[in-house]
Amino acid sequence: EILLALKKQGKTLLLSEHRLYYLADIADEFWVMADGEIKGKYTAAEAKAFSAEQRQTLSLRTLDLAEITVPEKEPLPKTAPTALAVSDVRYTYGRKAGDTLSGVSFSVREHEIVGLVGANGCGKTTIGKLIAGLYRPSGGRIMLFGKPQNPKQLQKQVLFILQEAEFQFFTGSVLHELQYGHVVTPEFEAKTEALLKSMDMWDCRDRHPFSLSGGQMQRLTLMMAYLSDKPIVILD
């Protein structure tokens, strides 16, 4: 709605994006970049007519979410142990602000993936930072594997991936970032090399993290999560 409103005002919009579906009926043209160059320009009608093979060749995502299929996976057994339990957790940013979180309770089992969704400002990031021990709750309890945890204990067991990936880099290269905090054995080196290659980042291993594109930075943080020995990972 905001983009349409800007378009009606006569604004010129240039969007740098991977996701195309919400632009299908807004964009006039789609320009495809690769290797630092604009490789092709297509009208909206031409882009909509791309086959799946053409999109894959151009590294484009679908314009129609109905085309996306999600592979089925076996449901977790109901007896799977609880990894994380949040009980009546409350949090406020100040006396005048009122409760940002008011009595939040839920549990997550081991090996379970949960998507926490909601509008901007509803408290998603706040609850994530509480679980990671970055904030101290004003009430309630957070338990990991059946044991109550204080913020310091949570920090040792929960990895929190920020929205702003660059705030989590501390070394001078992609490879050193993945090795940071680990005992670098030959086995770990082989694992890291395989991971970098699987994420199409092997050629970037000696680059400074800040020189990466936004998408590459996000991939680096995901690789850091994969190599982490922390049992709980929160992706903000």
Predicted region positions:
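Conserved ABC ATPase signature
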Residues: 208-212
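Conserved ABC ATPase "signature" region
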Residues: 187-204
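Conserved ABC transporter NBD signature motif
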Residues: 140-154
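Conserved beta-strand-loop-alpha-helix hinge in the C-terminal portion
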Residues: 37-60
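Helix-to-loop junction immediately C-terminal to a conserved catalytic motif
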Residues: 132
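The feature captures the beta-strand-to-loop junction immediately N-terminal to the Walker
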Residues: 117-119
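H-loop/switch region of ABC-family ATPase nucleotide-binding domains
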Residues: 17-18
